[in-house]
Amino acid sequence: PELQAQFDGFTAYTNVVSTGAYTNFGTPALMGGYEYTIDQINLRKDEKLVDKHNEALKMMPVLFDQNGFDVTVFDPIYANYQWVPDLSVFSDYPDIHRYITFGAFESDMIPKNWISANMRNFFGYSLMKACPVTVQSILYDNGNYNRSTVQTEEENYVEQTISGPHTATGMDATFLKGYHALTHLPTITQTTKSGDNTFLFMTNDTTHSPVLLQAPDYSVSGTVDNTEYDSENADRFTVDGKSIVMEEGDQFAHYDSNMASLMQLGKWFDYMRKNGVYDNTRIILVAD
């Protein structure tokens, strides 16, 4: 019910498709328009793909900047073909504000815990492979390698092990890096009475790292068990006679990550409403 109110007025276009199966194929056309579809990009054979990708990323921010808008860019995906976007692609436009929000709100302990967990898993993997095949699945333990369940929340927030369609332990640190950028949107948003036009281009990878979350509020938890809730609310996957298949843990994880993202965006929209700057006709939500 809350989402219906928060997203009231939006139009969902379901008859659309990405121009490519991967981000480096889908993003250019999404950001730059028809001139950056795969066939058009391929016509420029003497130019590097990275240069054409950067052009597409800059298309809207630069146009708005040149027309008097105050422009901000968050995490321009694959900028300069770097996994961590290279913000220098906007160096010719000093008035464009650019930031990396992915992982900006994480504890300093997360990287250390990630390294520690991987080192332990490498050792566990070696032991598993040295054992007879008949016992390897027991030692593997769905990727836990029989890890003790007695851990602090922060220690447990490195990776998630999905043990069934409705249960999981741990939490994926990559998911948290994107998710916490969404939860902080009201905090990092500033409203003014200047009346200046603004443009924000934001990439967020929360839905790119599917995890199981604790229903019904889809909150982050080191131990997730939605068995009872999913059983009692199985009808929520059918709307207007159309159903989505929800049988495997991965399917529920994708659903949960999308729900969590929409809920945080809804809270941000409420923040904008409260401050008198909300206009959904100027908000576009897309995926590549």
Language-model features, listed with the residues they occupy:
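Metal-dependent active-site segment of extracytoplasmic phospho-/sulfohydrolases and closely related
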Residues: P1, N258-D288
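Active-site-proximal alpha/beta segments of enzymes that process anionic O-linked groups
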Residues: E2-T238
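Active-site-proximal segments of metal-dependent phosphoesterases and phosphodiesterases across multiple
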Residues: I244-Q264
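Residue-level detector of functional hotspots within protein domains
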Residues: V16, G20, T174, I244, ...
